[in-house]
Amino acid sequence: LLGAFEHIRQLLSLTSSAKRDHLTPGYFSFNSGSGRCQRCSGNGFEKVEMQFLSDLYLTCPECNGTRFTKAAESYRYHQKSVVDFLRLTASEAMEFLEGIEGLTNKENLLLSKTRKALQPLVETGLGYLRLGQPLNTLSGGEAQRLKLCRLPNYRFPE
């Protein structure tokens, strides 16, 4: 949501285990990374075409809907895997990120950027949205508020 996941992927790639394995932030992308589930292409579900009926969507049996491989899930930033981050709500992510101390300058910068990206969601009452929530599951009102959050100078009425 609003670019926050980009910074989280960078934080995951800064861990000692990810550096040891020469992983980039792209590894933690469910859109194109090699860490995504190959069976469902990072969707978390498989589409079954039912000819005369509506298509059926089943949870991917390989990743169980997490979108990532077990190997990608094993990398952790302060005890949270990429899947754990995607399950957090915007409010939970803000709270988690504020509690981390003793970081490098680069980590502090990335955490600051992540909080800055999530802050409009919390301020507009969208703090309950999960970081990995598909956009097609949002209501019309949620989608509209999310769009307003992307405007750089927009201030919500109080």
Residue ranges, per PLM feature:
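Conserved phosphate-binding elements of NTP-dependent enzyme cores
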Residues: L1-E158
